[in-house]
Amino acid sequence: MSKKPVVLMVLDGYGLSDKTEGNAIAMADTPVMDKLMKEYPFVKGNASGSYVGLPDGQMGNSEVGHMNIGAGRIIYQDLTRITKAIADGDFFKNEELLAAMENCKKNNSDLHLFGLLSSGGVHSHISHVYGLLEMAKKNGVSNVYVHAFLDGRDTPPASGKDFVAQLEEKMAEIGVGKVASLAGRYYAMDRDNNWDRVEQAYRSLTTGEGKQAESAVAAMEASYAENVTDEFVVPTVITENGKPLSVVKENDSVIFFNFRPDRAREMTRAFCDDKFTGFERTYIPTTFVCFKDYDETIPNKLIAFKKEEIKNTFGEFLAANGKKQLRLAETEKYAHVTFFFNGGVEDPNVDEFRLLVNSPKDVPTYDLKPEMSAPEVGMDLVEAIKSDKYDVIVINFANPDMVGHTGVIPAAVKAVEKVDELVGKAVQAVKDVDGVLFICADHGNAEKMIDYETGLSLIHISEPTRLGMIS
């Protein structure tokens, strides 16, 4: 008789490192994981580079990790695909990108390039912006404006100024483009329906509201002088003679060059959904091109790179064999155990049930609440294990990754300790019902919260992860 349920637990950002300095996992009191590692079989795994369909040396991330786990095989990622398209020239023949260019020429209008200005490779890559600038130049589009969203999570926290300088140098070399606005990803790339943040970025893009600066580099320097690093840069409009260089207007074209959907959906909906309700605004008709389809329910957009279908995912296999499955996470990682785990498919499989726990909204950053909503997730997990309703449960604990990204090591230690406590409760519940628990991670983060050469590090890393089985 087979054991039931089988629980696949993803400890997000919980990697392996031999070093203890800056290692929140090693610094934490983790009696449960320590005991499990001694008494049950665990193996070391890789969650970066070519092991997960990324370029060699490229760090992994939550999306990539969950997509590979859910597929049960290597899935070649959008970063690799788009970079290759630029290299072999197919990028410059892309019909949707060309449509944006043609619209600008037809209406003598502006081309706006939105996205995360970063070499992190998690949501975007700066080389893709260069490709768009080259394409605009080749197609005779002269009014090109980059609205740069600043990173500081997948790159060092104060690297944005350098990326802006690199971009402006490349613009001068190609002969087209200006930086028209800046905004930290905290505002421009929210994914948890914090519409007040998104609205601030949206207003800077469409009406020129927000801070003002005469140059993008000067704006970054001013932000750093106020101890506000990249992720939290307040939406800032670059001006000339006291007026914004450019804002998005009717008949303009927009290309959103992020390839990862979860943090591009809200801003895209604000621009494209003519029935938008997130905040008050007037719909602006544009030719709006997304690198990927961030959300099938968002209308009035073009998709530059169509989804490559991933067949026979773990969820599909379970459904085909009549198994009931539950996906459980808090909202910060809900898309990862559903959309990404299912190979980029939004709709659930047959007999796939989903349980969503709201992430905290009473704190601006999770170092102020390192437990996040893990206690509620853990309680729901134990109830689901004991319910006898599900054959398979896929569950994500977000804390090591989300709190690790804050760079506050004591908070990350508390996050790891809270997760350890909840793992213990899940282990006991699984044993009580004679089930099986697999523990793994999607990528590393909390085990290396400092750069051993430069100090603070908030970025994903290429450290190995682990997989264990408890039965």
Annotate each language-model stretch with its function.
Residues 2-6, 15-186, 196, 200, ...:
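Active-site nucleophile/metal-coordination loop of metallo-enzymes that catalyze phosphate/sulfate
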Residues 8-10, 112-114, 255-256, 392-396, ...:
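Structural motif
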Residues 155-249, 255, 267, 272-284:
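Long, well-ordered, tryptophan-enriched scaffold segments
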Residues 236-323:
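Segments forming glycine/polar-rich beta-alpha architectures that bind adenosine-containing cofactors
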Residues 412-455:
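Metal-dependent active-site segment of extracytoplasmic phospho-/sulfohydrolases and closely related
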Residues 459-471:
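Single conserved hydrophobic/aromatic residue that forms the stacking wall/gate
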